Each structure stands twice: as C-alpha cells, then as structure tokens.
C-alpha cells in the first residue's frame, strides 16, 4: 500500500511536470498571436477592429503564464512528498511549513519566494486577475488620425516586448526548478 501511494505521488509530479510544459507552450502560443494581432491587425487600423482578439489572447497568455508557476509548485509538493492536497498547493504558510517539516534544503525554495515577491510575477498575476473582469490587462492604444500607432502597457512599455520579458522570466524560473529538484525526478519540457 505504501509503495502504491509513493508511486501515485511520483506520477503526480510527472503529470504536473508535463502540465508545466503544456502551460508554457500555451503562453508562447498566445504571445505569437498577440504579436501577430498587434503587428498585422491593429497597427495602422481603426481602434477596436481587433480588440476582442487581442483581449482573448492576452487573457490566455496571462492565465497560462501564471499556471506555469502554479504547476511548478505542484511538482515541488510531489517531489518532496509534502502530503498536501493538490487543490491546497499554493505558496502559503502550510506549504512553507511542510517544506520545513520535511527538512527540504533546496535553493529552489528561496527562489520560489523570490519569484512570488518579484515585480514581474506580481505584474503577471495582477494582469491575469484584472483581465478576467474586462480590464484590458492595462493595455492602451495610441491613436493618431483615427489609426492605432502603438500598443503599450500603461507603464509605456511596448506590449509585445513586455510579454516576451515575462515569458523569458518564467522560462528561467522553471529551468532553475528543473535543475534543482531531485535528480531524475522531473523534466519539464
């Protein structure tokens, strides 16, 4: 019985590891559509022509990006057998206490805390939450002569490079996670 439970936990970690790649590829896909919409469907055209398409893919991008991180926490919980219900795995006091109880000494744990408190992750999380309620993910179009000339974040950063930066940060994080988890247990992509 104990061996079966252990096998289920290992399987869960591999399942979640596959999900990380799935969500990351999903974010990458949505970014490719965002790039195409901004470049080909919005710039130089009347505003709102492709606004819905952009919003759908922005929502998908942010949901998949945050899901990549959430699945990484699932993998950590499974890899270290933290005995947390899968629907209760989140970076909170219970998770950190379980890591402490299991005497997990891995630099990944500190890195998870750094990511959670980082500006880029908080930005992605805020955008993911905001776009659900029709805040267009803090995006604005600069219009001149009735045509869109640029699509930017409200902080004036161009939309596509901003999304590319977030995706790059997430890739760096989960590659670090893959390298620091117990050898042979996890392969994300």
Segments from the language model and where they lie:
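Acidic, Ser/Thr/Gly/Pro-rich intrinsically disordered interaction regions
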Residues: 1-39, 45-63, 71-189
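Short, positively charged
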Residues: 68
């Amino acid at each position: 019985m104990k061996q079966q439970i252990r096998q289920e936990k290992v399987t869960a970690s591999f399942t979640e590891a596959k999900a990380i790649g799935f969500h990351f590829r999903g974010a990458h896909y949505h970014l490719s559509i965002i790039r195409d919409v901004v470049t080909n469907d919005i710039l130089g055209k009347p505003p709102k022509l492709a606004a819905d398409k952009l919003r759908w893919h922005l929502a998908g991008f942010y949901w998949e990006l945050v899901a990549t991180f959430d699945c990484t926490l699932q993998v950590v919980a499974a890899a270290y057998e933290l005995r947390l219900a899968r629907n209760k795995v989140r970076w909170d006091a219970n998770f950190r206490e379980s890591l402490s109880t299991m005497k997990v000494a891995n630099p990944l744990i500190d890195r998870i805390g750094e990511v959670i408190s980082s500006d880029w992750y908080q930005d992605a999380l805020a955008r993911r939450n905001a776009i659900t309620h029709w805040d267009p993910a803090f995006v604005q179009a600069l219009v001149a002569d009735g045509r869109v000339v640029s699509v930017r974040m409200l902080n004036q950063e161009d939309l596509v490079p901003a999304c590319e930066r977030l995706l790059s940060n997430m890739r760096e994080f989960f590659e670090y996670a893959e390298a620091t988890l117990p050898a042979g247990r996890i392969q994300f992509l």
